[in-house]
From Swiss-Prot:
Root EC class: lyase
Site (Cleavage (non-hydrolytic)) residue list: 189-190
Record membrane topology: Peripheral membrane protein
Phenotype of the disrupted gene, per the record: Initiates nodule formation in the alfalfa host plant much later than the wild-type and forms 90% fewer nodules. The nodules are almost devoid of bacteria and are unable to fix nitrogen.
Phylogenetic lineage: Bacteria, Pseudomonadati, Pseudomonadota, Alphaproteobacteria, Hyphomicrobiales
Cofactor: binding details: Binds 1 pyruvoyl group covalently per subunit.
Gene: psd
Main location: membrane
Protein family membership: Belongs to the phosphatidylserine decarboxylase family. PSD-A subfamily.
Entry's EC annotation: 4.1.1.65
Domain of life: Bacteria
Keywords from the named record: Cell membrane, Decarboxylase, Lipid biosynthesis, Lipid metabolism, Lyase, Membrane, Phospholipid biosynthesis, Phospholipid metabolism, Pyruvate, Zymogen
Name by which UniProt lists this protein: Phosphatidylserine decarboxylase proenzyme
Length: 232
């Protein structure tokens, strides 16, 4: 293996959405260096933090249509049965909701919790209250996807927070997504809600750390044997 290959395999990829921010931090750091050199080094540290924030590592996603995979890195902040947002059109029956809260240090790339076809994308303007609060799922700015899976329709909702005020979603209606496939990003702290129909059993508890594209949040059916994973 060459030195270049070693470096490439060691460094964590940065998502393209972060390039502009990293460039701005870097240029400002150089400019501050003309005023006072220590400011330049502080700026370089902040530039490195910005690159770390927009990191986009590969993940090993379990291959199983019965598993619901975490759509983001973070902490499980809620496991409850609630009504889904009206704009998703998921009906009038309560659904299992599992929420993953992302702080500013988590990787903020969002991934599909299950494989399927995107049936609806619904954006709703709103407030920017703390995304950890339960009311954030109804009051905050959000963008929801409805995905048709073999177990029926599920919802995954990107929710803005106090700092995060830019929700990005680059998939489209009628698109096919694989479990663990990247579909969006929320800048600087936020939350993802996953809404699941009857038959889904949670496999996580509140306070548990979740890894996007890898951690199993819930499962349809009984537990099975070893699961094969693929790189995503």
């Amino acid at each position: 293996m060459s030195l270049i290959d070693t470096v490439r395999n060691t460094l964590v990829p940065v998502h393209r959405e972060g390039y502009r921010f990293i460039a701005i931090f870097f240029v400002v750091s150089l400019a501050l260096g003309f005023l006072w050199e220590p400011l330049m080094w502080i700026g370089f540290v902040l530039t490195a933090w910005c690159a770390y924030f927009f990191r986009d590592p590969e993940r090993m996603t379990p291959i199983d249509d019965d598993l619901v995979i975490s759509p983001a890195d973070g902490t499980v902040s809620s496991v409850a049965t609630v009504m889904p947002p009206e704009e998703l059109g998921l009906g009038s029956e309560p659904m299992l909701r599992i929420s993953v809260f992302m702080n500013v240090f988590n990787c903020h790339v969002n991934r599909a919790p299950m494989g399927g076809t995107v049936r609806r994308i619904a954006y709703r303007a709103g407030k920017f209250v703390n995304a950890e609060l339960d009311k954030a799922s109804q009051e905050n700015e959000r963008n929801g996807l409805v995905i048709e899976t073999k177990h029926g329709q599920i919802g995954v909702v990107q929710i803005a927070g106090l700092v995060a005020r830019r929700i990005l979603c680059w998939t489209r209606e009628s698109a096919s997504l694989e479990a663990g496939e990247r579909f969006g990003l929320i800048r600087f702290g936020s939350r993802l809600d996953v809404f699941l129909p009857a038959g889904a059993e949670p496999r996580v508890t509140v306070g548990q750390t979740a890894t996007g594209g890898e951690t199993v949040l819930a499962e349809f059916g009984s537990a099975k044997g070893p699961v094969i994973s693929r790189r995503a």
